[in-house]
Curated annotation (Swiss-Prot):
This is Ribosome-recycling factor. The keyword Cytoplasm applies. Belongs to the RRF family. GO terms for molecular function: ribosomal large subunit binding.
């Protein structure tokens, strides 16, 4: 019973940390990363379609993304979608290939992005703490129903706290890594 609660809490905490890492990977650094364009949605024959389904995106070099479009007629629509995004990018096309040079980030923009990343990390920490609270509530309910002893409850809560500390540390590590990426010149 307690092991199920701990396993559930661990799984949910892992998912929270993965969601955070996924979220902050979309924040633009000075370095080209294909995941930067993951959020781009293109109108494809009247249906909103993720860019990944219409083209292959690779990092050509440290400051350039290359997009190989599967359907040549979609090139203008993809360019338009990239320009319409709030990423501040200017794509240029040559046939079925679109090149997206990444301009260097200004100091002010870097600081804004760090604020965004810190906010995301705080949401990640809150999520992990909420999962801890849920697990502790379930453990207290077991104690109240006399299904476990007070010693078992204390031990389980200590284990949940260790899990929480571990996952909050992972959130902090992801934040530190992203901040370092943002401050690179």
């Amino acid at each position: 019973m307690i092991n199920e609660i701990k396993k559930d809490a661990q799984d949910r905490m892992e998912k929270s940390v993965e969601a955070l890492k996924n979220q902050i990977s979309k924040v633009r650094t000075g370095r080209a990363s294909p995941s930067l364009l993951d959020g781009i949605i293109v109108e494809y024959y009247g249906a909103p379609t993720p860019l990944r389904q219409l083209a292959n995106v690779i990092a050509e070099d440290a400051r350039t993304l290359a997009i190989t479009v599967f359907d040549r007629t979609m090139t203008p629509a993809i360019e338009k979608a990239i320009m319409a995004s709030d990423l501040g990018l200017n794509p240029s096309s040559a046939g079925t290939t679109i090149r997206v040079p990444l301009p260097p980030l200004t100091e002010e923009r870097r600081k804004d992005l760090i604020k965004v990343v810190r906010s995301e990390a705080e949401q990640g920490r809150v999520s992990v703490r909420n999962i801890r609270r849920d697990a502790n509530d379930k453990i207290k309910a077991l104690l109240k129903d006399k299904e476990i002893s007070e010693d078992d409850e204390r031990r389980a809560q200590d284990d949940i706290q260790k899990l929480t500390d571990n996952f909050i540390k992972k959130v902090d590590e992801a934040l530190t890594k992203k901040e370092e990426e943002l401050m690179e010149f």
